[in-house]
């Protein structure tokens, strides 16, 4: 379950990890979809499952202030989902040259993916059931978050 033909790996079945991090790279929400599901389909789920964050003064807030995303999320409904939740969005535009300004913020997520894939159980999916693989993914995210506490 939650596997589909991977467009990168010659059509072999695979799955895709989705993650939302804070500015330090600590994972806040993780998700799992089939490899052939587009990234933008998972954005609303990820935004709905964000935990309440604390601001600098220690008061809990209901949502993050800003969202940085790559060109895979450049669709009107992704921007509307952020606006409806009062989140400022900085999404790279499709068809335009890649901006180094947004890259300063997005490398944090790529580093977090590298931290997740240090756990070899997540690098290659051995589990048949998606709930078990998602449990390992959540456990790895919790261990990464625990390391920074």
Protein language model features and the residues they cover:
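Basic, amphipathic alpha-helical segments enriched in Lys/Arg and hydrophobic/aromatic residues
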Residues: 76-80, 85, 89, 99-149
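Polybasic low-complexity intrinsically disordered regions
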Residues: 1-94, 101, 140
């Amino acid at each position: 379950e939650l596997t589909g033909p991977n467009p990168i790996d010659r059509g072999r079945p695979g799955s895709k990890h989705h993650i939302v991090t804070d500015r330090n790279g600590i994972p806040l929400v993780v998700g799992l979809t089939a490899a052939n599901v587009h990234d933008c389909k998972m954005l609303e789920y990820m935004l709905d499952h964000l935990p309440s964050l604390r601001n600098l003064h220690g008061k809990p807030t209901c949502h993050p202030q800003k969202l940085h995303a790559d060109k895979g999320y450049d669709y009107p409904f992704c921007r509307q989902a952020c606006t409806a939740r009062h989140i400022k969005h900085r999404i790279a535009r499709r068809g335009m040259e890649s901006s180094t300004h947004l890259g300063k913020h997005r490398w944090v997520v790529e580093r977090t993916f590298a931290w997740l894939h240090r756990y070899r159980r997540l690098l290659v999916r051995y589990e048949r059931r998606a709930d078990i693989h998602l449990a390992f993914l959540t456990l790895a995210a919790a261990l990464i978050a625990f390391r920074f506490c």
